[in-house]
Amino acid sequence: MPVNYHQIESRLPEYGKRMKEFETALAQAEPALWEQFTRLDEDVAALRAKIEKAEAQLRRLYCAKPVSEPLLTHKAAPLPPAGYTLIAADGSQIVPNRHRPVQFGVINVGLIQARLGSGTAPEVSIQSTLLDPEELLNPEGNLIGEDEVALYRDFAERRALLEAALAAQAPVIALTDGLLDIYQQYSAPQLNFQADMRKIHQQLEARGVISAGYVDKPGAEMLSRMLDLLHTPETDLIAYDDQKRSLRGISDARLLAKLLTVPGERSAVFETVSKGAAQTSLKVHFYYINISLGNTPYLARVEFPAWQIGRASCRERV
């Protein structure tokens, strides 16, 4: 069905006006949010205690939790080792469609593997898999959709990374394009990959593989969620609903761009708190890093397993 461009065009002036008002409101709210963030710089223990109390009381919560560094930490990212194996995975998929005469689904996983410092060319491989016929239907007998196929793809990426990492020369850094872990959604309860994901993470940990997820256009608002929770009276915690928070639209990257002004600098390390619709098999930490090559900050988010903090050999390479 084609778009009614005339109808859209007639609404553009009003839409532009409302969007400008929205952006103005965000710009006015941002200094107050930054002031809250800076004021809590050294209160890491108190912040953790408040968030952990909320975790114990709430069924649903999604926010950042500081680990140990002050909130205003900004430091140069560690240098990579002289020689290491870098493995990165990215995937794509074809979703079943009831308008096709034959139903099928395809999972595509691309791997690039490079031995840095060796002088050899990177190796590229592609693994393409058809979903089995029984995998195309959900428990109700309907065709699976984008969410379910994305879970199959995400799991295939992690499995391919594990297989490549176990055969690679150490030290190994394994990168996922996007979030580090698979978040099990209620929309696809039949695809419970959590047990298998735990096994993958355990094998990577036993091998000492430095695994990380790289998000190059982060839009998460985990820090503003954290600040909103912290300013909720403890007597009101039991009824707290982060979906009803008053301030939305200021991402972590937008907030921290004031702090990470030098290319190569990273932020403090935070822990991902996730309870509710998005279930995870892994305790994930993350930081933001300025990857800009110029004067304007461009922030990416790097996620990694919490266990890497406890190993000096891994901690200095994350």
Language model regions located:
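Glycine-rich oxoanion-binding loops at beta->alpha junctions
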Residues: 125-148, 152-155, 161
